[in-house]
Amino acid sequence: MNMNDKPIFTGCGTAMVTPFKNGEVDFDAFSELVRRQLEAGMHFLVPLATTGETPCLENDEKLQLLVRCREIVDDYEQRTGRSVPVVVGAGTNSLRQTVRNMDFFSPHGADAFLVVVPYYNKPTQKGQYEYFKAVAEATDKPVIIYNVPGRTGANMEASTCIRLAQDVPNIVGIKEASGKFSQIADIIAGVPKSFSVLSGDDDITMSMMNAGASGVISVASNAIPELMVEFVEALGAPQVCGADFVSAPDMAKSAELFYRLRPFFSACFVESNPIPVKAALALMGLIHNELRLPLVPCSANTENLMREVLGKLGYLK
């Protein structure tokens, strides 16, 4: 376990989308999205995960995206003195492939890895424990578990997460998207204070952080980074990853922001992520509304809903 008394990964991290143009990765648009996140004060970035449509990317595309992200973050850190970790999605349902991914990304600027509970295979709790232990032993970088049973078909139980947090030094956090609040509360109560429990669902971030979670890996922040940073900081997250915590949460402000943002949170999941948030970014003129099959652009109803909620938040001219 991390021997510090504060978690390493805290606040708001954006699960970055991957823009496409005419079927190819739009690296220029991606670069602008990264810059926009940094200027909004985002605490950390998460490229090449679910929201980035990573299963549909070629290895050379993944590498170019990471290198672009790293170069822009390095330049920002040099100019501002503010550290913004880059957490790279590397997980698969094969131990060997996950290790190959980590080896592939490690020399190119990954500060940590987000590793999903293996999908399709439906491993037991013992299998999950042994898998993540082996993953962590294969790298010297921090590893964050990603528990999202709605996509993987396998749920990591609280007891398994707690064992990993206690037994494996560089497993430093979990992105929890099970939607099982009693399980999440058990994790928060059972892991060391140095372990990051991060919401994987924007809509329950306030509930999780009020119960002691460290922050969120957000989809919504792709489109509304300034408001998400403000919201998470009002909940009492550190203003910068690894910095001192704010003195006290501003409960009135966080509640006001939650109810203001909640329609957008809901809109981001009326269709499979990242379909709606890509529609939002396209409406804002930041990307082309393209995805790679088997994902397709949103329905007209979803686009109209996004136009409505973004307009109310002041993000459309």
Q: Where do the PLM segments sit?
A:
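C-terminal alpha-helical cap/extension of soluble enzyme domains
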Residues: 8-19, 36, 40-42, 51, ...
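A general structural signal for well-ordered alpha-helical segments in protein cores
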Residues: 30, 62, 66, 98, ...
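Short helix-capping segments at alpha-helix termini
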Residues: 72-83, 108-109, 139-141, 167-170, ...
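Helix N-cap/beta->alpha junction signal
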Residues: 94, 201-202, 299
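Catalytic alpha/beta core domains of metabolic enzymes, predominantly
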Residues: 137-138, 151-269
